[in-house]
């Protein structure tokens, strides 16, 4: 075609976030100068958020294949075969930058977007989890962010009818100007309903489903997540400038869209389907066309608009929420319209699938043409694959932080502990129930274990699913304190922590997803952290036979040139083969023996490492070395605990009465949490001081049993270390000679700690 508009000024590409080299790449693809519209399309699709141009080379090192994986990375969500003809879809995403600017809408639309990723696969969304990271609560702005984000998640999730079943809540000064809002969603589908985001069938229609298109979210996450905050006073200095890039959500529209899409898929009316997330319509059209090896003509004048006077680039890149793109045959259009009318969902033909174009060299290329009318002027024409798959990939410089050796050498494990261990323990006990009380975790009545425990557990049941006694479990885990010291080992240990949490509810780990939250990739130290973290994840997943079936990379989490600590979040998915009874939970009983299952001492050079521990951080110590990742001993312990708890879930006779993973805060916190859950105390005599109380490393479980001899014998037969700690009873928590607390007073303090911190005004 002839160039449909004058060439763009040379400065425009920079204003859109494209480099000079990237402009040259675009010229080579097109063999001409791009026009304004085409530059805008490349700017959003080649942004860091959409293209992963700084991380994709490294992500290739992650294992993603296994016999039970139905869909791996690259689609809306990963999907595993959970058995009984049921697939489970899982996805995790970040909405960090939008939430820093507009916490309610940023978090709410994060939930909406992740749900669309899941039901685009044909899965009914069944649950949401939310790992959240904020600055310290002595800052009023951080308290405002916490309340806004939690309200946004609860407002959207409760209204759309999907339970929020858990997550994480972390406070650290590094997130003061750049909070992290990650959202994980899980859904289930009959495997016969599995859908993919592929356009095929020449002459088929591209149908836009859902909300009107407006200017909200123009260049939203694709721009916000591709640059840091520049203000020295944090995000506040640029809030107003970037606020229009934050999308606005409507959960009731989303609910209707879910039901309409699932009914369309049930009837077989849909050839391919994809949500409109980051980069909006241009992302959905270019990606579906590229996957199908076809071209697509899109009529911008056909798109239903909420605002007058929108320009073509605005229509194509708007990130207005609650929209899907479905590829359907002309024969099914009337039936599709009937279903959408039933659910009061707009359905508009905005495009056609077309033959790949014959190029001068004889090759065929699927072109994406943006038109003014289906037979009207071509406003822009680019190869679909060049937008979706061919962004330049950068192997950015990497450098180990120069001060890291000094930080590692400052090891709190070497110190003689000082201070009151009662205060230490009290400062580590925070119940996040204030957050979970705002979420409805029991929607659908399938939640067996909800927020606040090691992992969430749900029955694998829902409308349209085959009957099954199976269940699925989900956990989210992270440890930025560890990752700041040793991102490779720390990420491996975080993967192990996720498997440990699943074991506590009897679930066998099947797959993980990740959300990699890091600072500015243009800083070599940040790229070193990211590369090391990915290698650690690959190491652990290979050792524990876990495929990585999806993920998200969030970069440029910085403010005023200060990067956040590396924060890889691992979402772990497990399956319980027979779920006819709840797992034991934390509810030990008077007279039970309390047993530590797993190696009492850490792998590596230190028996009880305090480096990166919550205990040390609370004392202002952020250095030291971590335990080593030892796959062989971890796997044996995980298999044993999973089997013990799975037997309870299957309704088999068992002496096991309670189980809890030892993680953040160490053994002291695990015992205190179990005591607080029941107001029953325990006395533990033989402990190796502060180190054994507060050291953190995965692979240890506190289990309560009515028959210590039987449990010990089974553990020993499995080759798993085990030691009896004490007996449940009384009203005091006694840990060696260091801790002696009234359980009820401790439980009350723990229950109110977070709300007191939020209400300090």
Report the location of each language-model feature:
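Alpha-helical propensity feature that highlights long, continuous alpha-helices across diverse contexts
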Residues: 1-73, 83
């Amino acid at each position: 075609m002839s160039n449909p508009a004058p060439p763009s000024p040379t400065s425009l590409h920079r204003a859109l976030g494209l480099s000079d080299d990237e402009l040259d790449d675009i010229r080579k693809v097109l063999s001409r100068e791009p026009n304004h519209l085409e530059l805008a399309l490349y700017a959003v699709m080649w942004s860091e958020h959409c293209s992963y141009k700084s991380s994709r080379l490294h992500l290739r090192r992650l294992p993603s294949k296994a016999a039970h994986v139905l869909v791996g990375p690259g689609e809306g969500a990963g999907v595993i075969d959970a058995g009984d003809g049921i697939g489970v879809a899982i996805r995790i995403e970040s909405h960090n930058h939008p939430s820093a600017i507009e916490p309610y809408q940023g978090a709410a639309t994060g939930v909406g977007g992740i749900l669309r990723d899941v039901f685009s696969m044909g899965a009914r969304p069944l649950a949401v989890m939310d790992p959240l990271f904020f600055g310290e609560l002595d800052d009023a702005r951080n308290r405002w962010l916490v309340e806004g984000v939690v309200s946004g998640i609860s407002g959207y999730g409760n209204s759309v009818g999907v339970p929020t079943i858990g997550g994480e809540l972390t406070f650290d000064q590094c997130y003061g100007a750049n909070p992290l809002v990650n959202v994980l969603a899980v859904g289930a589908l009959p495997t016969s309903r599995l859908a993919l985001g592929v356009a095929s069938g020449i002459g088929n229609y591209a149908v836009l489903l859902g909300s009107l298109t407006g200017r909200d979210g123009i260049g939203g996450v694709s721009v916000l997540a591709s640059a840091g905050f520049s203000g020295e006073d944090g995000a506040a200095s640029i809030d107003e400038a970037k606020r229009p890039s934050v999308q606005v959500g409507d959960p009731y529209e989303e609910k209707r869209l879910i039901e309409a899409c699932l009914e369309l898929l049930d009837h077989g009316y849909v050839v391919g389907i994809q949500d409109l997330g980051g980069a909006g319509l241009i992302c959905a059209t270019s990606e579906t066309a590229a996957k199908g090896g076809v071209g697509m003509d899109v009529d911008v004048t056909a798109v239903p608009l909420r605002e007058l006077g929108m320009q073509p680039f605005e229509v194509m890149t708007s990130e207005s929420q609650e929209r899907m793109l479905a590829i359907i045959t002309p024969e099914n259009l009337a039936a599709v319209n009937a279903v959408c009318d039933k659910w009061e969902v707009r359905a508009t033909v905005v495009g056609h699938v077309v033959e790949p174009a014959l190029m001068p060299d004889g090759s065929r290329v699927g072109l994406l043409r943006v038109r003014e009318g289906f037979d009207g002027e071509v406003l822009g024409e680019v190869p679909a694959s060049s937008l979706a798959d061919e962004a330049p990939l950068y192997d950015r410089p990497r450098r180990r932080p120069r001060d890291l050796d000094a930080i590692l050498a400052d090891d709190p494990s070497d110190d003689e502990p000082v201070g009151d261990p009662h205060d230490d323990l009290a400062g580590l006990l925070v119940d996040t129930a204030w957050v979970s009380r705002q979420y409805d975790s029991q929607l659908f009545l399938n939640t067996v274990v909800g927020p606040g425990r090691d992992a969430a557990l749900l029955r694998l049941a829902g409308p349209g699913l085959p009957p099954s006694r199976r269940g699925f479990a989900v956990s989210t885990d992270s440890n930025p304190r560890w990752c700041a010291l040793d991102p490779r080992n720390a990420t491996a240990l975080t993967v192990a922590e996720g498997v440990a949490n699943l074991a506590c509810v009897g679930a066998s780990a099947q797959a993980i997803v990740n959300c990699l939250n890091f600072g500015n990739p243009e800083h070599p130290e940040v790229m070193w952290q990211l590369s090391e973290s990915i290698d650690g994840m690959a190491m652990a997943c290979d050792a524990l036979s876990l495929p990585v079936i999806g993920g998200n990379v969030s970069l440029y989490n910085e403010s005023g040139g200060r990067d956040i600590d590396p924060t890889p979040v691992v979402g772990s998915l497990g399956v319980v083969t027979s779920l006819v009874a709840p797992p034991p939970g934390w509810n030990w009983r008077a007279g039970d023996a309390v047993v530590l299952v797993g190696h009492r001492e850490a792998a590596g050079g230190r028996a009880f490492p305090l480096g990166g521990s919550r205990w040390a951080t609370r004392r202002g110590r952020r250095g030291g070395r971590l335990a080593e990742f030892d796959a062989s001993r971890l796997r044996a312990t995980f298999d044993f605990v999973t089997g013990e708890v799975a037997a309870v879930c299957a309704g088999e006779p068992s002496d096991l009465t309670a189980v809890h993973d030892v993680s953040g805060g160490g053994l002291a916190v695990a015992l205190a949490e179990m005591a607080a859950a029941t107001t029953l105390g325990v006395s533990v005599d033989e402990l190796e001081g502060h180190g054994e109380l507060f050291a953190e490393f995965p692979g240890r479980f506190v289990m309560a049993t009515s028959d210590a001899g039987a449990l010990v014998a089974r553990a020993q037969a499995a080759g798993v270390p085990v030691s009896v700690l004490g007996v449940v009873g009384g009203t005091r928590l006694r840990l060696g000679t260091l801790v002696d607390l009234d359980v009820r007073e401790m439980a009350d303090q723990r229950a109110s700690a977070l709300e007191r911190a939020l209400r300090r005004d």
